[in-house]
């Protein structure tokens, strides 16, 4: 079982209450961020623009970028005794990708031919799980190798955090960061720390990228009347303004993110070794893939450009909306797979497959109507959101096609990636080296893995998945227990049939989180 290190400074630094009804001024959650302007972020981000060309035509959409080499002060506590092994690394994080929406993870409906092919050349982890959710807590885990539990707060890296990029930079590895996941660069966020260069592709979702012309766009033309509300209207109007220059597939965010990654590789191929971190917001909402991908799942949609994203009230969604929503998401997944496939082809053409480790994963999944839930829902903390795809391709062909069934967690990413690059001297992390499962050195690194999303927490092992509210009375869809031996898809709550198993898992969850959680209430 993973040894949990103390990393709860954010909840105890100033004696903050764990009661979510007592809010502190300095914390930023996703909902509050959406309503804030990016104007207050300072001039550091706007160091320059790179005009990108697509098919011989200069893109109208800028990519903000910067070089932090002269401003980033590396933490003194990073040792430098290890010598990197000269392998490169490319990490691809694609937001909100359900594991069961990949052919290599068992989907027969959703088309993902490029990642399916990639998986055949790679190690595929069948039991990878998120730790802190949603977007920003997950990135804190990925970039530091440290647990964020028992909290799962929407806040930047702490000054005391040491990031993956900072460790690599200290060891002489060139680091690059490309993201259209705008939360990385939101007010007070700092996830570009330690990168020699970074690029922010503007305009995703509700990024306050453009402010007009508001009167030109009417979200009601893109959604059923029964789904409309003022908040949804405001969010989708922002998105329509952000994408007003979109003319062809090359203008979509997913395409532009992967194109920016190709450009970076061409520019840095001689900076060996290097690490490129590509963080794509797709297939996150809004789900509006190009028409040719949407038509793979249905011939006709209710609207020429049907927009589905945050702001919809779940109570307004009708049963006849769900098939359309599922097809919109499937199309977004297939389009994202296509874009990643183009990037993988470029990597191969550049001759990088023989000396580069390539990682594909996500932060979490989403709900598509399960138990009445649509979009990621804390109160239904099941595999739809906690189970994540994780595929790692190593140049050593002995690892091609391996499937690892042992439990792994998001907190294991950095403790695995560093040794893969030959860096063994940095140890201040909470996770384990999951590559030992691939080499056969160990058969297991965790007995249980844990996830927290808002006020809900889960414990997962090879036999059971259990979740409940860990801070209050709102049960959500819990307490919930799934029997994974007989219900791999987590469709049937058996908490009343196996109360003793539920109590045992509840106690383990409390012990791991090191907080008092509500008792099991049946």
Question: PLM features: residue spans?
Answer:
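Intrinsically disordered, low-complexity regions enriched in serine, threonine, proline
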Residues: 6, 27-28, 50, 66
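N-terminal secretory signal peptides and thylakoid transit peptides that target proteins
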Residues: 16-41
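Catalytic domains that recognize anionic headgroups
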Residues: 33-48, 54-522
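N-terminal acidic, proline/glycine-rich, low-complexity intrinsically disordered segments
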Residues: 1-11
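Serine/proline-rich low-complexity intrinsically disordered segments, especially terminal tails, linkers
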Residues: 12-14, 19, 23, 61, ...
């Amino acid at each position: 079982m993973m040894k949990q290190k103390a990393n709860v400074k954010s909840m105890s630094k100033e004696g903050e209450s764990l009661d979510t009804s007592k809010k502190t001024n300095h914390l930023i959650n996703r909902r509050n961020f959406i309503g804030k302007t990016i104007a207050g972020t300072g001039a550091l981000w706007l160091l320059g623009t790179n005009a990108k060309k697509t098919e011989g035509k200069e893109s109208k959409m800028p990519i903000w970028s910067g070089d932090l080499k002269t401003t980033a002060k590396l933490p003194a506590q990073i040792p430098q005794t290890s010598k990197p092994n000269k392998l490169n690394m490319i990490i691809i994080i694609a937001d909100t990708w359900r594991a069961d929406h990949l052919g290599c993870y068992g989907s027969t409906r959703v088309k993902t031919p490029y990642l399916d092919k990639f998986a055949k050349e790679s190690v595929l982890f069948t039991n990878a799980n998120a730790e802190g959710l949603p977007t920003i807590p997950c990135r804190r885990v990925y970039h530091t190798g440290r647990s964020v539990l028992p909290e799962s707060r929407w806040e930047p890296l702490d000054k005391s955090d040491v990031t993956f990029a900072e460790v690599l930079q200290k060891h002489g590895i060139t680091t690059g960061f490309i993201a259209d996941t705008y939360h990385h660069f939101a007010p007070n966020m700092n996830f570009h720390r330690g990168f020699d260069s970074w690029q922010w592709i503007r305009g995703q979702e509700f990024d306050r990228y453009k402010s007009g012309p508001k009167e030109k766009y009417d979200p009601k033309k893109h959604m059923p009347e029964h789904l409309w509300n003022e908040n949804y209207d405001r969010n989708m109007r922002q998105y329509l303004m952000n994408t007003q220059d979109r003319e062809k597939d090359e203008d979509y965010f997913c395409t532009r993110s992967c194109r920016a990654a190709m450009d970076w590789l061409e520019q840095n191929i001689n900076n060996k070794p290097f690490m490129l971190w590509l963080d794509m917001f797709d297939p996150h909402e809004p789900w509006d893939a190009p028409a040719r991908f949407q038509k793979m799942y249905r011939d006709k949609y209710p609207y020429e450009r049907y927009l589905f994203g945050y702001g919809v009230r779940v109570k307004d969604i009708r049963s006849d909306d769900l098939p359309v929503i599922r097809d919109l998401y499937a199309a977004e997944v297939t389009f994202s797979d296509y874009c990643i496939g183009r990037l993988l082809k470029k990597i191969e053409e550049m001759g990088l497959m023989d000396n580069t480790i390539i990682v594909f994963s996500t932060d979490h999944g989403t709900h598509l109507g399960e138990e009445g839930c649509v979009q990621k829902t804390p109160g239904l903390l099941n595999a739809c959101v906690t189970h994540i795809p994780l595929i790692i391709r190593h140049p050593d062909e002995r690892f091609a096609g391996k499937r690892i069934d042992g439990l792994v967690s998001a907190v294991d990413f950095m403790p695995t990636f560093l040794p893969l690059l030959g860096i063994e001297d940095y140890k201040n992390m909470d996770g384990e080296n999951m590559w030992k499962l691939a080499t056969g050195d160990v058969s297991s690194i965790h007995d249980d893995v844990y996830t927290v999303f808002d006020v809900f927490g889960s414990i997962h092992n090879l036999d059971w998945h259990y979740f409940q509210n860990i801070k209050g009375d709102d049960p959500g869809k819990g307490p919930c227990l799934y029997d994974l031996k007989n219900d791999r898809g987590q469709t049937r709550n058996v908490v009343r049939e196996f109360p003793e198993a539920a109590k045992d898992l509840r106690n383990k969850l409390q012990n791991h989180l090191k907080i008092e959680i509500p008792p099991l209430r049946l």
